[in-house]
C-alpha cells in the first residue's frame, strides 16, 4: 500500500501548477495595458513618440 501513497504525492504536484498559472494570468493583464498605450501614441501628434516606433505603420 506504500505504492498508493506515492501516487498521492504526484497529485499534490499538480496543485502547485495551478498556482503558477494564476500568476501568469496577472502578467498577461499587464501586457494588455501596453496595447492601450500604443493606441494613445497614434492619437497623439508627438514626433518624439513616433520615433519610438509606436505608430510607425500609421505614419505611412
Curated annotation (Swiss-Prot):
Disordered as annotated region, ranges? 1-60
Q: Where is the composition biased (Basic residues)?
A: 10-35
Which key words tag this protein in UniProt? Metal-binding, Nickel, Repeat, Zinc
- Chain residue ranges for the region called 2 X 5 AA repeats of E-E-G-C-C: 38-55
Q: Does the keyword Repeat apply?
A: yes
* sequence repeats by residue range: 38-42, 51-55
Query: GO MF terms on file?
Result: metal ion binding
UniProt lists compositionally biased (Basic and acidic residues) regions at: 36-60
Ranges that cross the membrane: none
Role noted for this protein: Strongly binds nickel and zinc. Binds other metals less strongly: cobalt > copper > cadmium > manganese. May act to increase, or at least to preserve, urease activity. Exact function is still unknown.
Task: State what protein this is by name.
Answer: Histidine-rich metal-binding polypeptide
Per the UniProt record, the source organism is Helicobacter pylori (strain ATCC 700392 / 26695) (Campylobacter pylori)
